[in-house]
């Protein structure tokens, strides 16, 4: 009974195929594609050949739909292999961009002969390239989060390569003054990446960002790195203790399986605990900073007056940003030590994001050190002693 049903289905396919082949020259791939879902065949090419032989149809000179694109599949697979040669990957995704004329001819025939539920020519081309490429590379198709995505553009005869972004976590300490945290963007592309900056978005490497980027460029062969910093410091500040945490997003790296050292010395900075993570946390990450400040005053300050700084301990500090939005920061502990008649040290532990110099000078911060002491104050320097969770 089952065999009889299969024969009936096959007879119907033969009947439906005849008028199509009478009007259009189709290759075995395109012919088999129209009917494979009605059969138990696994190969569209074999089904197309069987249909052609069953009705004694002549071999096509050139396929009306695809212009024999499948005859050149080895050429395009070679293009994919060459394009992906320097990349590390185990999972892949293949995409294709066909000429509009091909998809229009495919749509025309499917509409004309009411061929519903049929895979498009784009789907079949993509699938055939996937089969051949994975057979050679032993890669696994992953439609959700592939290591590498290869897109063949049949209009330009070019293979575009993109890899999955990598995310890293690390910390840095800074032992010398005069090094900015952030690097100035390339003046030609404003940080987007261009030929002049080798798509890095930066040209120089004389900052924390630049020095960390240089390490990541070399190890992962990535072009662009985007950083998320847990707080910031002044150019003249030291970063001590266990270091300042940061997150890095690597755009389209060629290497992903990289051995990362626990500690890496890069001139004025040391990178600690660099490791891969699944993603960068969203939103603001709460943290506290232990900071030592050297403060100078316009007027002489007495030890008795400095005692008033203890009023700042534990109270909310209101910080108003450029948009007029108010933020609350807490001073969790505060100690001071007089250095001279017009200078003193403050060691405080505060919520991350407290603008230290503004907190000293009183610019859009209330209360502030200058307000408590009732004299003009300036922060000569401050160092980050520790970043705390």
Where are these regions (language model features)?
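Non-catalytic RNA-recognition surface used by pseudouridine synthases
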Residues: 2-389
